């Protein structure tokens, strides 16, 4: 049996490969996440570490966005360019901070998730250039996910407050095309807030049935490993 690497979350098969030098060359210095791995391999835990620093006031929201997009784009050549365009749309980070403010609360409800999604979707509020739902749901996931602590364990993205709360998850084409009809998501890319929330409820239900985290359901779906009951 193949052992899961120490850095991997349950359900995470492999790290994302990134070309660090290309990203460093393209990005403004203030946006580079402090202490971010320079190995060229990124696990979800690495991005959650930046999210934890953001929650604690030790990282800016621009640094969080960069960490998310480096992981999200991976080795895709236009990733750094598109990330710079997004950053230029919010040079002081105020639009992103406004979108994510509800996710910083110790306890947040479904309405906070809906509001964050809608703000990032609306150009009149917080939508940034080159940042559609396939990417901004990654930001919502890393900024807002609360992992149920097992045996008192702690760490990035881990808190006992995760129990019972609806968790934000990634919704991109890789996920959407594998979801069953009962998940409530249309094919396409410009999903409505109601579709995202329907998917979150579906994933939460599947996670409860299987005794796993909701993001493990998302990973299984995106990798084509999800099996229906």
Residue ranges of each PLM-predicted region?
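Structure-specific DNA junction-binding interface
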Residues: 1-88
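C-terminal accessory module of base-excision DNA glycosylases/AP lyases that mediates lesion recognition
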Residues: 1-29, 137, 144-229
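Short acidic alpha-helix initiation/capping motifs at coil-to-helix transition points
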Residues: 40-46, 113-117, 197-198
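Residues that form generic nucleotide/phosphate-binding pockets
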Residues: 50-54, 67, 71, 102, ...
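Helix-hairpin-helix/helix-loop-helix acidic hairpins
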Residues: 57-60, 72-128
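Histidine- and/or cysteine-centered catalytic micro-motif in compact active-site loops
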Residues: 71, 141-144
């Amino acid at each position: 049996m193949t052992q899961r690497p120490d850095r991997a979350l349950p359900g995470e098969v492999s790290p994302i490969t990134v070309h660090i030098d290309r990203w460093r060359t393209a990005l403004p210095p203030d946006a580079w996440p402090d202490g971010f791995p320079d190995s060229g391999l990124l696990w979800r835990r690495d991005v959650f570490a930046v999210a934890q620093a953001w929650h604690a006031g030790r990282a800016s929201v621009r640094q969080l966005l960069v960490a998310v997009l480096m992981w999200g784009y991976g080795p895709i050549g236009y990733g750094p360019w598109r990330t710079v365009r997004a950053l230029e749309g919010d040079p002081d980070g105020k639009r992103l901070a406004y979108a994510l403010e509800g996710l910083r609360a110790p306890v947040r409800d479904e309405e906070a998730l809906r509001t964050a999604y809608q703000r990032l979707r609306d150009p009149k509020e917080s939508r940034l250039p080159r940042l559609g739902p396939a990417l901004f749901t990654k930001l919502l996931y890393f900024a807002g996910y609360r992992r149920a602590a097992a045996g008192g364990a702690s760490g990035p993205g881990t808190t006992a407050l995760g129990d019972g709360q609806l968790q934000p998850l990634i919704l991109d084409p890789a996920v959407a095309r594998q979801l069953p009809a009962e998940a409530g998501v249309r094919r396409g890319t410009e999903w409505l807030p109601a579709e995202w929330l329907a998917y979150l409820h579906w994933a939460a239900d599947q996670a409860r049935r299987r005794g796993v985290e909701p993001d493990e359901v998302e990973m299984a779906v995106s990798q084509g490993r999800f099996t229906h009951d």
